[in-house]
């Protein structure tokens, strides 16, 4: 297996995306353990510019850590894990291109793969943690309890508490769950949302504009943070599609999260849509059929309000175009 040769390197950095979720963190924890087994004298660490509250709870439970840093020092070998586009990382891109980059992901393949020496992308897997768990199984290496907890949390989180699970998912859960209470996994993933997230949800709903097209309820809104969670919440309370924009002046960045119901994804793949819109805005995007996101630079010559309006109108326009095109075929 070619992957093992890269894991055996003397120094490896495992990179998570912004606000690293349990799938990203669980996958990195497992890869770091595997690398340490293959090269006991190696130097291995995990880095992200931020991690989610749920991920922090899991890391505390299993006694692992993620170094929180922007523009980390890059060793010769860098693993990028559970990340759809380069804009989800706070790294020196020119420096990264000169490194030995390995990508393991379950999102739609994007330009990020072009700079990689080696990559494993399995879009049909509901989580990256399942890809990693399968690697352990193929190698006949049974991971320790803390690593299995991390992988199980990643799987359950990214499958929306098994709503997106398939038969392979349950096979891998059965493989990992020995001596672990499933109730414990659910508990680690059900910590109450912090006040800032709940406040963002309320603001997103209060600012929401609903447009109707072909009997679809398309919700457009904006917040300062937690845009992905807000988009998910808006769909859960009745929208067919939701686009939520967050403009971060300090980081000079625009973020958009999109979510939709399953019947909509039969016509429009949100990951593909976000990739196209991301490029149109001078950034990048990607994701899955029912969930996508993009990052793009923020032009400070325009007001925040104007940018929000322009981006939401663009998302609506491009979605309608793609939907019409799909229905005609």
Swiss-Prot record:
Transmembrane segments: none
Domain of life from the UniProt record: Archaea
Pfam families on file: DHH (PF01368), DHHA1 (PF02272)
InterPro entries for this protein: DDH_dom (IPR001667), DHH_sf (IPR038763), DHHA1_dom (IPR003156), Oligoribo/pAp-PDE_c-di-AMP_PDE (IPR051319)
Annotated region described as Disordered, given as residue ranges: 284-303
GO molecular function terms noted in the UniProt entry: nucleic acid binding
Protein name (database record): Uncharacterized protein MJ0988
Taxonomic source organism: Methanocaldococcus jannaschii (strain ATCC 43067 / DSM 2661 / JAL-1 / JCM 10045 / NBRC 100440) (Methanococcus jannaschii)
